């Protein structure tokens, strides 16, 4: 499994990430070819060898004539939809833009469609975000891990004036993700950089890996206390996971005053809304009240809808959420014939290796009802049929 580790000792921005990808071996012409598929003109893209505190790095420079072009979320979404980019590239770029847009919408108290992108709607930010999606598609690491992002103090100047660091949009984007405090008084993590990391990486320490390449993407400033670089380590994970991974949101809250009948209905409604899993666990709460701990595993695009459902249909006054990477076994259903009829068997694979199998409950229950035999006996028959089938199959 190929692994990319983002060492964010000096933070992350869109242009630093793009420079890192090029320094790791992504050809700039390949990124340019992808950007040419957008209905955006009037800019030139260059790479430059530079150094930060005597460390050589790649700096990406975007030259353009555009002045303060404010694009809306609909403009960005339409631009991506009308492009001839690969669907996977469009999907990642859209998720990065949307994450920034949702942060801006929350800060300004507006709907997403009413948000005007200022800095992020400019040509150079469009190049950074779409270029990052194109470059990652070329590099195609199986897994990306990012170190916790450094949050600094000071002020930053933007279209709405001066704001204290960390920038409000950056904080919204990084909700639920690991960060560390930093004594620098300059912006190290930009909203674009934060959104790229949040949408592409899991967060943690450097995993065990066989290192193959190291790249450096340069930021604009010369920092006094460290090289202003985003460092990337590309290699192979020493203990590769050959199954699947995805990103989910975990929603949680404690309830001590909910009618149990409502909770049963809430679980049904959450699953109908698209939750991957819903669980209740008993706990003892303040004032010695018995309560329940609600946990919901949500696809990222269903997070807000499921959170709204919880808050509307339970007694919760708030809830916690965090994003997580999920390791998954690939699932497959095999239909096998037993002396009593057809039964469905669930197969679980890591990569191409079959790890286990299990009879599917509904089909076993149907056979138990039609045959009059106990359900455990049907399970044993289904398991034996499956083991015999796969033993012969090899």
Swiss-Prot record:
Top-rank taxon: Bacteria
Keywords attached to this entry: Nickel
GO molecular function list: lyase activity; nickel cation binding
Alphabetized Pfam families for the sequence: Ni_insertion
Stored InterPro entries: Ni_insertion (IPR002822)
NCBIfam families, alphabetized: nickel pincer cofactor biosynthesis protein LarC
Family: Belongs to the LarC family.
Designated name of the protein: Putative nickel insertion protein
Origin species: Syntrophotalea carbinolica (strain DSM 2380 / NBRC 103641 / GraBd1)
């Amino acid at each position: 499994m190929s692994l990319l580790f983002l060492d964010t000792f000096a933070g992350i921005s869109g242009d630093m990430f793009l420079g890192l990808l090029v320094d790791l071996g992504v050809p700039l012409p390949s990124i340019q070819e992808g950007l040419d598929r957008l209905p955006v003109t009037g800019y030139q893209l260059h790479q430059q060898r530079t150094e930060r505190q005597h460390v050589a790095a790649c700096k990406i420079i975007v030259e353009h004539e555009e002045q303060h072009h404010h694009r809306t979320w609909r403009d960005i979404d339409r631009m991506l939809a009308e492009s001839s980019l690969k669907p996977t590239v469009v999907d990642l770029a859209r998720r990065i833009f949307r994450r920034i847009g949702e942060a801006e919408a929350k800060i300004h108290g507006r709907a997403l469609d009413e948000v005007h992108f200022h800095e992020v709607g400019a040509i150079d930010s469009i190049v950074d975000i779409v270029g990052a999606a194109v470059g990652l598609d070329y590099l195609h690491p199986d897994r990306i891990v990012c170190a916790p992002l450094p949050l600094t103090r000071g002020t930053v100047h933007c279209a709405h004036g001066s704001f204290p660091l960390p920038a409000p949009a950056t904080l919204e984007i990084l909700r639920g993700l690991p960060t560390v405090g930093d004594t620098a008084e300059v912006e190290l993590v930009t909203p674009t950089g934060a959104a790229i990391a949040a949408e592409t990486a899991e967060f943690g320490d450097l995993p065990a890996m066989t290192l193959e390449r190291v790249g450096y993407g340069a930021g604009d400033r010369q920092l006094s206390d460290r090289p202003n670089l985003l460092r990337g380590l590309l290699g192979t994970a020493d203990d590769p996971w050959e199954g699947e991974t995805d990103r989910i949101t975990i929603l949680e809250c404690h309830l001590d005053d909910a009618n149990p009948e409502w909770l049963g209905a809430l679980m049904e409604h959450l699953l109908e809304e698209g939750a991957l899993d819903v669980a209740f666990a008993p706990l003892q709460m303040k004032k010695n009240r018995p309560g329940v701990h609600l946990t919901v595993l949500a696809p990222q695009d269903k997070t807000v809808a499921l959170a709204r459902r919880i808050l509307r249909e339970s007694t919760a006054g708030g809830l916690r959420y965090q994003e997580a990477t999920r390791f998954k076994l690939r699932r497959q259903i095999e239909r096998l014939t037993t002396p009593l009829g057809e039964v469905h068997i669930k197969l679980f694979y890591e990569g191409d290796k079959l790890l286990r199998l299990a009879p599917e409950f509904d089909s076993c229950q149907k056979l138990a009802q039609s045959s009059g035999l106990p359900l455990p006996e049907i399970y044993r028959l289904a398991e034996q049929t499956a083991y015999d089938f796969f033993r012969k199959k090899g």
